[in-house]
Amino acid sequence: MKRVFLFILTLGSLFMVPYAAMADETVTVTATSSDISENLDLKTVATLFGQAKDLEQFEALLNTPDSAFSNLDLNGDGEVDYLRVIETADDNRHLVVIQAVLAKDIYQDVASIFVEKDANNQVTVQVIGDEYIYGADYIIEPVYIYQPVIYDWFWGPSWV
């Protein structure tokens, strides 16, 4: 009886090995240079922001594993850091902060996106790199050919 139990246990373990291997999938970081600011291009961040329909999709675009545009490893664990997106708003101004998740409840600001609509309904977007990573006054002001859909998400009607 003991041998039958061990045989079934061994056989069951063999079937579980492929699933365990898939659960431990990691992404290896290969730094493009010693300058960490080159591992996240803020022009690409501005482009992805303009392509997103809302902040949830923007966060998903930032963290797409198949794209090699984000290669940040700020905590040095050998894996690409997940980038989370948080937002605060005040009237016609929105602040979107991109943070690298370093550990549980530990975050590092990477960039901020200021979105503001003036009295003439003109929207200004500024992507500002964190001073620690990008140096002082690293600001990108994207010009979009078409109005990004995310503007509607910021100022469109909302239903509760």
Give each language-model segment a name.
Residues 99-160:
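Low-complexity segments
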Residues 1-8:
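Bacterial N-terminal signal peptides that target proteins for export
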Residues 70-82:
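Acidic, glycine-anchored loop motifs typical of Ca2+
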Residues 23-25:
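Boundary of Sec targeting at the N-terminus
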